[in-house]
């Protein structure tokens, strides 16, 4: 099974940024553990702070992969274009957020992605990525 993990802006700073909200583990460390646990799956990873690069990656994998795990970061609440890109592809997407976006500031409760995703995992920390993989391989 081919699964793409796509992370949006500032997720490259996990482990350094707001550790009280996002935890102290870097995504690279977490990804290594994830790839080891799911060694029978092909897991690709992409991160960008640039909206257009995220859209390009969604389009690149969106017709050939079995699943996309997508954390759009701050673009969740602002990018109609990312929502449109997800609507345009055939690969199912699970939207993942490390923090509970529905329990934070009011502006974070809007997602331009959720309505196009097959599901949303929010507030379960990095475990949300693992749960998304479990969904795809079930």
What are these model-derived regions, one by one?
Residues 1-4:
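Extreme N-terminal starter segment of soluble prokaryotic enzymes
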Residues 9-11, 73-76, 99-101:
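Short glycine-rich anion-binding loops that position phosphate/pyrophosphate groups of nucleotides
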Residues 14-28:
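Glycine- and acidic-residue-enriched helix-capping/strand-helix junction motifs
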Residues 44-52:
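Short beta->alpha junction loops
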Residues 44-45, 94, 103-138:
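Short, glycine-/small-residue-rich phosphate/pyrophosphate-handling segment
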Residues 53-57:
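Short acidic active-site motifs
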Residues 61-68:
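Short acidic/histidine-rich motifs immediately flanking catalytic phosphotransfer sites
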Residues 79-88:
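Short Gly/Thr/Asp-enriched flexible loops that form oxyanion-binding sites at enzyme active sites
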């Amino acid at each position: 099974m081919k699964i793409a993990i796509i992370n949006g802006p500032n997720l490259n700073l996990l482990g350094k940024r707001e550790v009280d909200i996002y935890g102290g583990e870097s995504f690279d460390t977490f990804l290594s553990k994830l790839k080891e646990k799911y060694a029978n799956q092909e897991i690709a990873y992409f991160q960008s702070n640039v909206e257009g690069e995220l859209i390009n990656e969604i389009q690149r994998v969106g017709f050939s992969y079995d699943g996309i795990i997508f954390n759009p970061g701050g673009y969740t609440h602002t990018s109609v274009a990312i929502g449109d890109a997800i609507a345009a592809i055939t690969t199912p997407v699970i939207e993942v957020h490390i923090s509970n976006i529905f329990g934070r500031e009011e502006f974070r409760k809007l997602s331009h992605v959720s309505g196009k995703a097959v599901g949303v995992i929010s507030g379960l920390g990095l475990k949300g990525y693992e749960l998304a993989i479990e969904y795809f391989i079930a």
